[in-house]
Every structure is written in structure tokens, then in C-alpha cells.
Amino acid sequence: MFKKTILFTAKRTQEKADLEIELQQIASKYTFAPKIHKVEKFPDRYEVTMDKIDNMCLADMYSDDPKKIPQRIWTQIHAILTILYEREGIEYIDITGYNFIEQDNKVYIIDFGDARYKTDKINWFLKDFLSGQYEWNPDFA
């Protein structure tokens, strides 16, 4: 198990933290993200207990350079983000090598702090990514 603290700030309000937890719970139903077991609520933060994925992120495992990420990894990331977008209406835009972990040949997505439900206009980078342009999002570099 792993415990993550989500502090409430001017930028990350309690409502935003609620959304982050909700979206990760949805992704975990597909086994795309660590399962959340417990959320402890405090006036200034949440303490979230979840499954621990005991491996390095893709950037540390392979490189920060998207060209060094194996195609099988890109294929899994594309499948994860497509399902979250098309079935659940989730726009996950923080697409960097630091927010994906590979364990036992399976890719997991972490950090839903910048994820959101889709709006009338899809995020420009997610649109390109879902169309097959496999790069890391420069807005989060």
C-alpha cells in the first residue's frame, strides 16, 4: 500500500482534489491506475491509501526522450487514454514519462491532478495524441 497526501491550496481546491480521486477511481476499475482503498479527509488535505506500483516511471526506466519509449508502451498508453476519453469522458492531458509506470509488461497511469471531464472542445495535445502522434505533452515538460 502507498499513502498519498493531497494538500488543498489556492490552485488545488478540495473540489479539484475530489475530482482527482474520482477520476483515478474510474481508471482503476479498468486496472489502468492504482486502486484507492481509503480516503481520509482533513480540513486541509486528503490522505489517500492506494495500491503501490513498485517500479520506476517510464522517464526513469527508459528516458525522457519519447523516441526511446518502446512502441508496445505507446500502444498501451494510447489504449488507456482512448478508453478513458471515449467510454468515460475523461481528458487526461498530463501525458509525460513521469505519469506512467510499467510493471510486468503492463502500463499504469498515475497523477490525475490535471485530468478533467471532457468539454465541448478536446485539449489540443490529447487530440493529436489520440490521432497517433506519440510524444510527451510539452505543456507539462
Regions found by a protein language model. Name each.
Residues 1-21, 25:
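ATP-binding glycine-rich loop module of kinase domains
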Residues 28-32:
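Flexible N-lobe loop architecture of eukaryotic-like protein kinase catalytic domains
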Residues 35-73:
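Conserved structural core of kinase catalytic domains
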Residues 54, 97, 114:
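Short, glycine/acidic-enriched loop or turn micro-motifs at the edges of active sites
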Residues 80-87:
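Conserved hydrophobic alpha-helix
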Residues 87-97, 102:
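Catalytic-loop of the protein kinase fold
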Residues 90, 103-141:
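C-lobe/activation-segment region of protein kinase-like
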